[in-house]
Amino acid sequence: QALHHVIGMFGKMNPDPDARRRFIPMGSMGGYAPGTNAGFYPDDSGTFLPKDAKFSFQMHYTSFGKAVIDETQVGVWLHKKKPKNMMQGTFIANYDIKIPANTKRHTESKEYTFEREALLYSVLPHSHFRGIASDFVAIYPDGSREMLLSVPNYDFNWQLRYELVEPKLMLKGTVLHVIAYFDNSAGNIANPDPTVAVEYGDQTWDEMLQVFFGAIPVEIVKPCTFKLP
């Protein structure tokens, strides 16, 4: 009840003791959100952990009037030999969302451009109580479009990671267009307050448009990286 979500990362420490950000993220260590299912990498793939990498876990708590103990656990499985493929976790977000009060179906969007060819394996959308649906459309370099995933009934309590039946080739220059739908009306029984306009924020009474997805570059140019928005 208290743990809202966990964001795991690995990286290195900034040698400058006066730096605003001491921890420099380099890759994803996964995470947790209500109802999230386990993510499985394809055979002969993994995430590259550099020598002397540090782990960071951002724990987000929401109070509910009772003292409790966090029993979160983290498990790491190591390959006995170097895998063939490097899975890369990418996170994108729209920090400028503005959802009007008393609005039944409001849309917001965000785009991500693939800078090199990659195989897309999984997608995980994240919103709060006003999030109701999302669509993921690939816009290929030739201008053609393809609906990769439609989530018609998003539920904050079941934030699922969607594994594609077959990985999808994202050509260099392909745009992943994400459309999120929000219900800020009194008809949404989970809505904390339909009378107020809502913007991006960390608390559940705020809102978010975030997407986490996993992909393997067709040609590995450098070790796994974690792209910050």
Predicted regions and their residues:
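Beta-strand-centric surfaces of beta-sandwich/beta-rich domains
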Residues: 1-119, 125-229
